[in-house]
Amino acid sequence: MTATYERLRHSTDSAALSEFARRPLPDRSDQAAFSRATALLEAVAGNAHTPVGDRVFLAETMPFPNILVKLSTDESPEVRKAVAGNADDKNWLVGRLTKDESPEVRATALRNKRTSWKMRLEGAEDSTMDSDTLDFLGSLGTQVEPDAPVVLATMVRRAVALNPNVSDRMLQQLAQDASSDVQKAAQRQLAEK
């Protein structure tokens, strides 16, 4: 297997890499074949000659941490964004993507349910965050993820209210929030506008 792994890792044959990326995995009941295939997919995922569309496909569909970790450092923001949106991400991995250099990757990671509340709070406090992502974060615990932990969702919504990039529409919504802390923060921001 090591020779095949190295061959795939260093291959410049995009067509062969693409075919391997799209090949169905063996049945999980054949553990040896399944493990071998997922290990080899890691080599394909990490090869820059694998077409971007195939790397995005792997990033969106693979539940395997070794492959997702490899793709999370891909040179293409499109691939990293796909990893950030993968519902099978480990929370530490999607958390790392909330700090990505690409605003689109960060925004996608913050919308992933696997993202920790600490990372969501940091995103809500980020003065460079876009208003669409702030709209999402400002809806946590209300319209979005209504069963979210109340205290944590409230902290995030309050941080959104204090963010200079929050949209006027979201600020108006937060001024009517069920939490008095969120209401006060939003009303203070509205008064300063």
Report each predicted region and the residues it spans.
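Alpha-helical scaffold segments
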Residues: 1-193
